[in-house]
C-alpha cells in the first residue's frame, strides 16, 4: 500500500528514485511508526500520513538544494534530513538535535537501512562547532526565520545558504530580517494530498 502511494506521489512531484531508495523511504516510515509508539517522535500516528507529511514534505525541498554538505538543525527524528539524504546520495547531511532518543532513533535508521551519507549529532545548536562549515543549513524547526539566522549564524560557509521550511508565510517575518541577510528565493512547494501551504525560503548573507 505505502509502496504504491510512494510511486504515485513521486510521479506527481516529478522525482525519480531507484528501487533501493524507495525501499529506504518506506523502511524509514515503518521504523518511525514502530519507534513512535514507545518514544513519541512525532504527533502523526498514521503511516500514510507520515508518508505525506514527513517524507513527501521533506522531498519537496530536494530539487532546490545547491551544494554538497548540509546540516539539518532541530531535525527531530531526522526530518527533512533523512529523506533528503536517501534521495541525494552524493550529498552529506549532519542531523543535529539535542534529544538523545531522537539521535538513537536516527542511528538505528542509519544502521538498519544502510544510509551512508548521514551523521547524527546530539547537541544544542549554539554549542555545536563544526570543523567544516556547511553549504546549506536546513530547518523546519524554528518558529521564525529571524530565530534560525540568530542561532545558526556560525554554521554556513561564507557563500552558504539557509533553507527555511515554512508553512504559511507571514509577510512581516521577512521584514524583520537583520539587514545583513537577504531572501533570494521564496518557493511555493507542492506536496501531494496536502492541502496546506508549504514554502521554502532561501536566505544568504549579503
Swiss-Prot record:
Reaction(s) this enzyme catalyzes, per UniProt: guanosine(527) in 16S rRNA + S-adenosyl-L-methionine = N(7)-methylguanosine(527) in 16S rRNA + S-adenosyl-L-homocysteine
Keyword Methyltransferase: yes
Domain of life from the UniProt record: Bacteria
Location of the protein in the cell: Cytoplasm
TM spans (from-to): none
Record carries keyword Cytoplasm: yes
Binding site for S-adenosyl-L-methionine: 74, 79, 125-126, 140
Annotated EC: 2.1.1.170
Main location: cytoplasm
GO molecular function: rRNA (guanine-N7-)-methyltransferase activity
Pfam families for this protein: GidB
Record CDD domains: AdoMet_MTases
Family: Belongs to the methyltransferase superfamily. RNA methyltransferase RsmG family.
Listed NCBIfam families: rsmG_gidB
Summary of the function given for this chain in its UniProt record: Specifically methylates the N7 position of guanine in position 527 of 16S rRNA.
PANTHER family associated with the record: S-ADENOSYL-L-METHIONINE-DEPENDENT METHYLTRANSFERASES SUPERFAMILY PROTEIN
Protein name: Ribosomal RNA small subunit methyltransferase G
Organism from which the protein derives: Shewanella sediminis (strain HAW-EB3)
Source taxonomy: Bacteria, Pseudomonadati, Pseudomonadota, Gammaproteobacteria, Alteromonadales
Amino acid at each position: 500500500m505505502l509502496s504504491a502511494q510512494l510511486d504515485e506521489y513521486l510521479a506527481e512531484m516529478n522525482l525519480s528514485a531507484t528501487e533501493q531508495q524507495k525501499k529506504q523511504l518506506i523502511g524509514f516510515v515503518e521504523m518511525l511508526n514502530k519507534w513512535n509508539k514507545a518514544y513519541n517522535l512525532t504527533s502523526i500516528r498514521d503511516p500514510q500520513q507520515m508518508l505525506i507529511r514527513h517524507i513527501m514534505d521533506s522531498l519537496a525541498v530536494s530539487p532546490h538544494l545547491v551544494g554538497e554538505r548540509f546540516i539539518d538543525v532541530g531535525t527531530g527524528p531526522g526530518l527533512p534530513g533523512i529523506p533528503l539524504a536517501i534521495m541525494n546520495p552524493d550529498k552529506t547531511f549532519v542531523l543535529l538535535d539535542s534529544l538523545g532518543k531522537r539521535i538513537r532513533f536516527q542511528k538505528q535508521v542509519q544502521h538498519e537501512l544502510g544510509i551512508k551519507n548521514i551523521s547524527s549529532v546530539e547537541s544544542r545548536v549554539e554549542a555545536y562547532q563544526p570543523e567544516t562549515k556547511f553549504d546549506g543549513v536546513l530547518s523546519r524547526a524554528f518558529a521564525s526565520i529571524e530565530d534560525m539566522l540568530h542561532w545558526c549564524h556560525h554554521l554556513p560557509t561564507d557563500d552558504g545558504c539557509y533553507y527555511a521550511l515554512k508553512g504559511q508565510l507571514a509577510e512581516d517575518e521577512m521584514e524583520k530580517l537583520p539587514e545583513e541577510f537577504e531572501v533570494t528565493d521564496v518557493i511555493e512547494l507542492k506536496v501531494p494530498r496536502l492541502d496546506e501551504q508549504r514554502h521554502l525560503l532561501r536566505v544568504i548573507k549579503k
